Amino acid sequence: MEQALENQGPAREPFNEWTLELLEELKEEAVRHFPRPWLQACGQYIYETYGDTWEGVMAIIRILQQLLFTHYRIGCQHSRIGILPSNTRGRGRRNGSSRS
């Protein structure tokens, strides 16, 4: 006969609270990188599509994560994960060879 597993590990904060904190952090970061009218239009679209639901919260989180990741990846000045321009990737050399 199977027994229910006991709660092991530290207590976690409720999912809803964690989700709202994540959304606030993403919004704060997005405001630093994107124009407010863009973000307001995105929020309005989500509200019109999903209403005031958890599905809408999850959708805006997903969109903000994708926007920020793409923004950082293509070269945000504040990011360390941006793509280097092709002319700085080896300073014109191929396969690590140097010509002197």
Swiss-Prot record:
Subcellular localization(s) per the UniProt record = Virion; Host nucleus; Host extracellular space
Q: Residue positions of the PTM Phosphoserine?
A: 79, 98, 100
Where is the segment annotated Homooligomerization? 1-42
The superkingdom listed in its UniProt entry is: Viruses
> Alphabetically, which GO biological process terms does the record hold?
DNA-templated transcription; monoatomic ion transmembrane transport; protein homooligomerization; regulation of DNA-templated transcription; symbiont entry into host cell; symbiont-mediated activation of host apoptosis; symbiont-mediated arrest of host cell cycle during G2/M transition; viral penetration into host nucleus
Q: Name one GO cellular component term.
A: host cell
Principal localization reads virion
Which positions make up the signal peptide?
none
Q: How is it modified after translation?
A: Phosphorylated on several residues by host. These phosphorylations regulate VPR activity for the nuclear import of the HIV-1 pre-integration complex.
A family per Pfam: VPR
Q: Which InterPro entries match?
A: RetroV_VpR/X
Extra facts: HIV-1 lineages are divided in three main groups, M (for Major), O (for Outlier), and N (for New, or Non-M, Non-O). The vast majority of strains found worldwide belong to the group M. Group O seems to be endemic to and largely confined to Cameroon and neighboring countries in West Central Africa, where these viruses represent a small minority of HIV-1 strains. The group N is represented by a limited number of isolates from Cameroonian persons. The group M is further subdivided in 9 clades or subtypes (A to D, F to H, J and K).
Q: Which family does it belong to?
A: Belongs to the HIV-1 VPR protein family.
What subunit structure does UniProt give? Homooligomer, may form homodimer. Interacts with p6-gag region of the Pr55 Gag precursor protein through a (Leu-X-X)4 motif near the C-terminus of the P6gag protein. Interacts with host UNG. May interact with host RAD23A/HHR23A. Interacts with host VPRBP/DCAF1, leading to hijack the CUL4A-RBX1-DDB1-DCAF1/VPRBP complex, mediating ubiquitination of host proteins such as TERT and ZGPAT and arrest of the cell cycle in G2 phase.
User: By its UniProt entry, which HAMAP family does this protein fall under?
Assistant: HIV_VPR (MF_04080)
**What is the protein's name according to its record?**
Protein Vpr
- Give the organism, scientific name: Human immunodeficiency virus type 1 group O (isolate MVP5180) (HIV-1)
| The organism's taxonomic lineage, starting at the top | Viruses, Riboviria, Pararnavirae, Artverviricota, Revtraviricetes
**Gene it is expressed from:** vpr
